[in-house]
From Swiss-Prot:
ATP binds at G48, A49, S50, G51, S52, G53, K54, S55. Keywords: ATP-binding, Cell inner membrane, Cell membrane, Membrane, Nucleotide-binding, Translocase, Transmembrane, Transmembrane helix, Transport. Belongs to the ABC transporter superfamily. Macrolide exporter (TC 3.A.1.122) family. It comes from Pseudomonas aeruginosa (strain ATCC 15692 / DSM 22644 / CIP 104116 / JCM 14847 / LMG 12228 / 1C / PRS 101 / PAO1). This is Pyoverdine export ATP-binding/permease protein PvdT.
């Protein structure tokens, strides 16, 4: 009957064994059939020499390690049946660890170290800060909240460790050699704190090799060679826990909370994400030289993609604008056969006259031209000289900026007059007025009567402004010796029906040339489409080349993250000991990879804009597009996350006790 009223133990071990080795290595059994029960309100000391198995027993009690065999029940739950998140809940909500080596995160302040369990518990920031400051003040560290571990003495670090253990309540304090690394005065202070916690109703499990320290406990369990050799439990166990213990530490209460609260607390992910961002920034800043080298790959990759695409888009827009400036209703006819094996045809003046009669045609302009030497004074200059009719300004949408264009009378009389392009004017006359001056074209004098408006390059192979327009008749008689045009420019009557006009011209030419297709027809719209396709292909190629450097940057992220995981293995163990789930660790390191990518991406965009500005000063066509910038940044972020996932997953899968033991 007495047993029926006995409270259910918080912790109950039955025949716990722990073995290491196997798989080709010698097997060592560290714990050999350990059985014990611990109730609410107990202050227990587990004492034993070094290597006796007491620390291994503590790791199993705190769910940092799993036994090889036997059963461990916590608050009536079989711990072996709990998944990793449920065991993390126990470490976060039920246990508080005080380690011999303090196990504080070096890059975090005292307050940030204390707050860590509360972050994983999803406690709001304001409440978290208040509670952490209150605990540190209670432990005499009110003036040390912003100090990092290396700025604290050993005793102060251990008090920070105790404050951290109490952050989420610290119902069960697991203290592993808490005085082992301290001087006698600091050790006495720590033991006084543990006595105080025990008197307040916390379960305190003290792991020590010092029998004088163990004597402070109400119950002493001696472990030797992995076995319990003595246990004072029968006489020393308190019969009635305090009111605080009744409220917080009864097994059935913790059992219910475990069943309800092992999932991620509401809102915890926000706190954890903010903490992950802050931690990532701290690590990046502390290792800023290494971070800068890693970021360099991402920066170069993003900048390359953005600049390459901007140059490609700028070139495309420039070419499209310049080609479109000549009109989208333009059709070109030449004597070049589309069949390279066929003989070259001749487009005659009769063909031109016949085309002009078609209803689908608005204007027809034969062109007889070529690259010739032009002289003014002692300046010789090569320019394209084209014999055209008076429809030139209208067909090509190319007005005269200075002077006038030649007339039908000039055409009929084969008058030697010339309208020069903007570039020719600059080269031959500089700032002087060219109107009325004479130039020599192939030693034939022509009087300049006008200057064409600046037009720009047509397609990159000829400079449209580097040309001279003269009457077609004068060009045929004085310069080229033939009335047959080099090619014909035709303006369709309707810009929306250019293809119909092209078909009508094709049918007419086939009839005039007796079914022989010894000519070639192209229209400006088709040329623009073809050029656009070419430019798109070029942009894609440039972007692909640049993307390779972005890929290299991603590999750099993976490399640095793998190195970070190796260097911060103990920190990962500390986070797990304070209640971090595997998902929390994964989120932490993925956030760091994302931070690297975000900072590198933003810096890459800034560098790209600077390079673009320099290129614009150098008269290079550059057109930044929001889609290219967002795309490059997104690719950098995705690349960082993809390459950061493997290191993050490796970190999340670390064994807590092995991580804590790493150097």
């Amino acid at each position: 009957m007495e047993n029926a009223t006995q409270p259910v133990p918080l912790i109950e071990l039955r025949d716990i064994r722990k073995r290491y080795g196997g798989n080709g290595t010698p097997e060592v059994e560290v714990l050999k059939g350990v059985s014990l029960s611990i109730h609410a309100g107990e202050f227990v000391a587990i004492v034993g020499a070094s290597g006796s198995g007491k620390s291994t027993l503590m790791n199993i009690l705190g769910c940092l390690d799993r036994p090889s065999s036997g059963s461990y029940h916590f608050a009536g739950h079989d711990v072996a049946e709990l998944d990793s998140d449920e065991q993390a809940w126990l470490r976060r909500e039920a246990f508080g660890f005080v380690f011999q080596g303090y196990h504080l995160i070096p890059s975090a302040s005292a307050q940030e170290n204390v707050e860590m369990p509360a972050i994983y518990a999803g406690i709001p920031a304001s409440e978290r800060h208040t509670r952490a400051r209150a605990l540190l003040e209670r432990l005499g560290l009110a003036e040390r909240t912003a100090n990092r571990p290396h700025q604290l003495s050993g005793g102060q670090q251990q008090r920070v460790s105790i404050a951290r253990a109490l952050m989420n309540g610290g119902h069960i304090i697991l203290a592993d050699e808490p005085t082992g690394a301290l001087d006698s005065h600091s050790g006495a202070e720590v033991m006084a704190l543990l006595d105080e916690l025990a008197s307040q109703g916390h379960v305190v499990i003290l792991i020590t090799h010092d029998r004088d320290v163990a004597a402070r406990a109400k119950r002493i369990i001696e472990v030797r060679d992995g076995e319990i050799v003595s246990d004072s439990a029968n006489d020393e166990r308190p019969a009635h826990p305090s009111a605080g213990v009744e409220r917080h530490l009864q097994a059935d209460d913790l059992s219910q909370r475990l069943a309800e609260g092992s999932s991620e607390p509401s809102g915890a992910w926000r706190a954890e994400l903010l903490e992950a961002v802050r931690a990532a920034w701290r690590v990046m800043w502390i290792n800023r030289f290494r971070t800068a080298l890693t970021l360099l790959g991402i920066i170069i990759g993003v900048a390359s993609v953005v600049v390459m695409l901007a140059v490609g888009e700028g070139s495309k827009r420039q070419v499209m604008a310049q080609m479109g400036a000549f009109g989208s209703n333009i059709i070109y006819l030449s004597g070049y056969s589309p069949n390279p094996r066929a003989p070259m045809g001749i487009v005659s003046s009769d063909d031109v006259a016949a085309i002009a009669t078609l209803p689908q045609v608005k204007k027809v302009m034969p062109v007889n031209g070529g690259e010739l030497v032009v002289r003014y004074g002692n300046i010789d200059y090569h320019a394209y000289v084209g014999g055209n009719n008076t429809d030139f300004p209208e067909i090509l949408n190319w007005p005269v900026a200075e002077g006038s264009y030649f007339t039908e009378r000039d055409e009929d009389a084969a008058t030697t007059v010339a309208v020069i392009g903007y570039k020719v004017r600059k080269k031959l006359f500089g700032s002087a007025n060219p109107i009325g001056r004479y130039i020599l074209i192939e030693n034939v004098p022509f009087q300049v009567i006008g200057v064409l408006a600046e037009k720009g390059s047509s397609s990159g192979d000829k400079d449209a402004d580097n040309r001279i327009a003269i009457p077609y008749s004068a060009a045929s008689i004085r310069l080229f010796g033939t009335r047959n045009p080099e090619y014909v420019i035709i303006a369709a009557a309707d810009a929306q029906r250019v293809h119909q006009a092209e078909r009508a011209i094709d049918q007419l030419m086939l009839r005039l040339h007796r079914g022989q297709r010894d000519y070639e027809l192209t229209n400006n719209a088709a040329m623009i489409q073809a050029e656009a396709k070419t430019q798109n292909t070029l942009s894609l190629m440039l972007g692909s080349i640049a993307a390779i450097s972005l890929l290299v940057g991603g590999i750099g992220v993976m490399n640095i993250m793998l190195m970070t995981v190796r260097e911060r293995t103990r920190e990962i163990g500390i986070r797990m000991a304070t209640g971090a789930r595997q998902g929390d660790i994964l989120r932490q390191f993925l956030t760091e990879a994302a931070m690297l990518s975000v900072v590198g991406g933003l810096a890459g965009i800034a560098l790209a804009l600077c390079i673009g500005g320099v290129l614009l000063l150098g008269q290079v066509a550059v057109a930044f597009s929001l889609s290219a910038i967002v795309g490059a940044f997104s690719c950098a972020l995705v690349t960082g996350l993809v390459f950061g996932f493997m290191p993050a997953r490796k970190a999340a899968q670390l064994d807590p006790v092995a991580a804590l033991a790493s150097q």
